[in-house]
Amino acid sequence: GFSLQDELDFLKKLHDEELADVQAQIQDQQVQVDMDMAKPDLTAALRDVRLQYENLATKNIQESEDWYKSKFADMTEAANKSNEALRLAKQEANEYRRQVQALTCEVDALKGTNESLERQMREIEENFAIESSSSQDNIARLEEDIRNMKDEMAKHLREYQDLLNVKMALDIEIATYRKLLEGEESRITTPLPNLSSFNLRDAILETKPILENTFSKKVLIKTIETRDGEVINESTQNHDDLE
């Protein structure tokens, strides 16, 4: 498109051409008047014609200049408005550019924060996995220790039960022999009617039924049943036995 300067140059050229055309017409009329100097009756008419053309030329020149000045003023105002609009557009563009730069910096900062958070999350997940694995190992080890302790406790309880049963049996046997010996001592210290007919073996055999019928003892047997180190059943039984 044409710029303001191009349009002004075009108007000036047009004005110059119109002015030259009017001047040429006046010159032609002047030549015609000079050629017709011999005609006195046309002198006044030619003078009037020349005056009319001069007035017309002056009017055209003035109108052209006024139009040119008006057009120039309009274009200058339009140019000023365009310059103001351009200035505002540049200012707005600069503001948009500043906002874009600020948003770009903010986006970069958010990206950095996001990457940092993702890295921390990965580290937390890795640490959690390690701690979880370690905890599972510890739990498995503790469960194994508990099972071993329960087995060991059950073993000790069984050994204790066996020892208790053996002790009870020994106590019963010792008490039985003690009573037998006390009974024999009592028979020996008793006066015998005929020593020649006394038989120690017969005396012991005779004494044993008497002791069995005379002395008795309550035997308490306590049974403890365990499973995995825990007592699941406990019972007590009374038995009559010799002492």
Swiss-Prot record:
Keyword match Nuclease: no
Domain IF rod: 1-188
One protein family per Pfam: Filament
Chain intervals for the UniProt region annotation (Tail): 185-243
Region entry Linker 12, spans: 23-45
GO biological process terms held by the UniProt record: intermediate filament organization
Keywords: Coiled coil, Intermediate filament
Coiled coil found in the keyword field: yes
TM regions (residue ranges): none
Protein modification: One of the most prominent phosphoproteins in various cells of mesenchymal origin. Phosphorylation is enhanced during cell division, at which time vimentin filaments are significantly reorganized.
SMART domains per the UniProt record, alphabetical: Filament (SM01391)
Top-level division of the source organism's lineage: Eukaryota
Region (Coil 2): 46-184
One MF term in the entry's GO annotations: structural constituent of cytoskeleton
InterPro entries cross-referenced by the UniProt entry: IF_conserved, IF_rod_dom, Intermediate_filament
UniProt-annotated stretches for the region Coil 1B: 1-22
SUPFAM superfamilies: Intermediate filament protein, coiled coil region
Tissue expression notes: Expressed in low amounts in retina, optic nerve, and brain and in higher amounts in spinal cord.
GO CC annotation, single: cytoplasm
PANTHER family per record: GLIAL FIBRILLARY ACIDIC PROTEIN (PTHR45652), VIMENTIN (PTHR45652:SF5)
Homology family: Belongs to the intermediate filament family.
Biological function: Vimentins are class-III intermediate filaments found in various non-epithelial cells, especially mesenchymal cells. Vimentin is attached to the nucleus, endoplasmic reticulum, and mitochondria, either laterally or terminally.
Summary of subunit composition and partner proteins: Homomer.
Name of the protein: Vimentin A2
Organism: Carassius auratus
